[in-house]
Amino acid sequence: MRKESRAMDSLWALEVMHKAPYITVSFIDEEGKPYGLPLSLASDDDVNWYFHGALEGKKLEIIKTHPEVCLSAVTRCAPTVGPKDGSFTLQFKSAIAFGKAEIVTEDAEKIHGLRQIGERFLPQHMDAFDQSIARSLSRTAVVRITLTEPPTGKRKQYDKEGVEMKYGRME
């Protein structure tokens, strides 16, 4: 990371990943070209992250031959005029992680992954989860991304006095 003063620890980065409305997952396709998609991921152990989709498609084909992925999450993204110098800038919280994607084949783990996604994005509707699973499990692909190293975090944020919060300083 070029600006070490903005680096944050892996626990902080995991918090960003849990709060981000989506996480961009980047793959390398069969031709060696980058392929990034914003996906709705969820995890209950901070190591295994799940997403779901159709049983066919480009990302599933890519995973079979190139399972290595990079995840990028951003929260609190706010265009800002620098309080001290009037510069145009952006306040943000971000996380980067690397992992290995695998298509889940066991129904029990598919249900576990889908439950994590449901609890994260639709907790108020979990009473309908079992019915939804009964209807759609056989036509839903679930992918597990296992992080291969702790995520890294980066932040640019100003405090109430307009001073940039550096070197992990918290509010």
Show which residues each predicted segment covers:
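Beta-strand-connecting loop/turn residues
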Residues: D46-V47, P67, T148
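Short, basic/aromatic recognition patches
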Residues: M1-T24
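Charged, gly/pro-rich active-site loop segments
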Residues: R2-E4, A78-E171
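Short N-terminal helix-initiation segments at or just after the protein's N-terminus
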Residues: A13-L14, K33-W49, V81-S94, H125
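Histidine- and/or cysteine-centered catalytic micro-motif in compact active-site loops
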Residues: I28-E30, A54-E56, V74-R76, K100, ...
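Short nucleic-acid-contacting surface segments enriched for D/E, G, S/T with interspersed K/R
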Residues: I63-T65
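Short beta-strand segments
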Residues: A20-L55, L71
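Histidine-centered metal-chelating micro-motifs
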Residues: E56-L60, C70, A78-P79
